[in-house]
Amino acid sequence: MDKRENTASHVLARFRGFIQAAATLVTNIHLPNFAKGGIYQGAGKTVCVPGLNCYSCPAASGACPIGSFQSVVGSSKFNFSYYVTGTLILIGVLLGRFVCGFLCPFGWLQELLHKIPGKKFSTKRLKALTYIKYFVLLFAVVLLPVLVVNDLGMGDPFFCKYVCPQGVLEGAIPLAIANAGIRSALGQLFTWKLAVLIAVVVLSVLFYRPFCKWICPLGAFYALMNKVSLLGIRVDACKCVSCGKCSKVCQMDVDVVRAPNHAECIRCGKCIGACPVDAISYRYGLDVSAEKLPLTADKK
């Protein structure tokens, strides 16, 4: 493993929090719009941001890829969203779930909530719940907007309308605070979405990134690309001493030695910092050498 590569990996992992904050700010750069009660509608809204960030957020500088995809597949013309799908595939191939670990505002929020002092619970025995997000992607994002339509042939953006807590947090709540007309129009749907948001907030305090692990369709899409993405995690078999510290520190419940580029790995780099022999690093490119060992990390 190249020494410069290892050093760069440690630096990237160490400054992840700053990168998350910067990514959130860039994704929501139009902060004065919170006071104005309006949303930015400029040219930037024709570009999809990589993470989950509501189009209706007053500060949003770009479009949410999930919302953009649903607005097209649910239209009466039923045009397949080549642009959005192509953008997602490109990001997935280049970065995989690095987006979740470094660039997603809602992922960062869940991490901050989990830092609130109190009893925490492991999700290792709840791994079956990670498959829910794939059903959300297939049904709530793709199939239902196409199959369930009104008399005009228009489908609802089911995930954005009925599930996504980010839409309430970034869009509905700040817009309702600033606009009396919007406040007066709030009804049962807002109450339901607010309940979803509260549930996610509470769960995020107790569990590490529950929405990312179990519900997020964007995370599900990037997870499908994780093993083929150019940015990944490398474990040097010659250096690894099978101490198991990497897997113990992983809050995404990944067996780092056995499957360093598992679908649930968000490239957070905690395993890199935990390794006592510097056997783990980020890698970029098609090189998959020294990527896994035959034994799990907790065996010697």
Language-model-derived ranges and their functions:
Residues 1-257, 263-300:
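Non-ligating segments of multi-cofactor redox enzymes
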